[in-house]
From Swiss-Prot:
GO terms for molecular function: rRNA binding; structural constituent of ribosome. Residues 92-152 form the S4 RNA-binding domain. Part of the 30S ribosomal subunit. Contacts protein S5. The interaction surface between S4 and S5 is involved in control of translational fidelity. The gene is rpsD. It comes from Geobacillus kaustophilus (strain HTA426). This is Small ribosomal subunit protein uS4. GO terms for cellular component: small ribosomal subunit. Belongs to the universal ribosomal protein uS4 family. InterPro entries: Ribosomal_uS4 (IPR022801), Ribosomal_uS4_bac-type (IPR005709), Ribosomal_uS4_CS (IPR018079), Ribosomal_uS4_N (IPR001912), S4_RNA-bd (IPR002942), S4_RNA-bd_sf (IPR036986). It comes from the Bacteria.
């Protein structure tokens, strides 16, 4: 399955979460596309709830189904809780951490910055969005890319930097200091439903 590249507001409304991080797409019309007015949402089956939760997390991180499933299976081989490990692996993606550092307004924008070679990891250019950053590694904007308007606008937005990251705005450089705890990851996701979905 290919990665979805259409309007994110449609997906946000369908799943009932903000994928842009601003919440604007849910303010005006907080009901699914195609539904004329804020009527009652159709009650989902157990399978439907599990599928919806999987889609929420997959679209949140902008991962295609093949990568998503592969990461899920990898998380199952790690010690600890399967669902929690899965979310930590997704959070450790380079494109996500570029977004978390406030260098991009959205994960989609962060993915483009990585793909176009604007991001360094420990001083070396990495253009793979799914690259897994390890604790202690440094993420920085390439010197030639520091005047990019999209990066300047993102930094001006004063985004919240999670406690598992440190960031120096003058150097446009941050460090992934440690793995996040579950309480620091998206609260609107019930990862147990995703584990149930893939365990069927």
């Amino acid at each position: 399955m290919a990665r979805y590249t259409g309007p994110m507001w449609k997906i946000s409304r369908r799943l009932g979460i903000s994928l842009s991080g601003t919440g604007k797409e849910l303010q005006k019309r907080p009901y699914p596309p195609g539904q004329h007015g804020p009527g009652q949402r159709r009650k989902l089956s157990e399978y439907g709830l599990q599928l919806q939760e999987k889609q929420k997390l997959r679209h949140m991180y902008g991962v295609n189904e093949r990568q998503f499933r592969k990461t899920f299976e990898e998380a199952g081989k790690m010690p600890g809780k399967h669902g929690e490990n899965f979310m930590i692996l997704l959070e450790s993606r380079l494109d996500n951490l570029v977004y978390r550092l406030g260098l991009a307004r959205t994960r989609r924008q962060a993915r483009q910055l990585v793909t176009h070679g604007h991001i360094l990891v420990d001083g070396s250019r990495v253009n793979i969005p799914s690259y897994r950053v390890k604790p202690g590694q440094t993420i920085a904007v390439r010197e030639k890319s520091r005047n990019l308007q999209v990066i300047k606008e993102a930094l001006e937005a004063n985004n919240y930097i999670p406690d598992y990251l440190t960031f120096n705005p003058e150097k446009m450089e941050g460090t992934y200091t440690r793995l996040p705890e579950r309480s620091e990851l998206p609260a609107e996701i019930n990862e147990a439903l995703i584990v149930e979905f893939y365990s069927r």
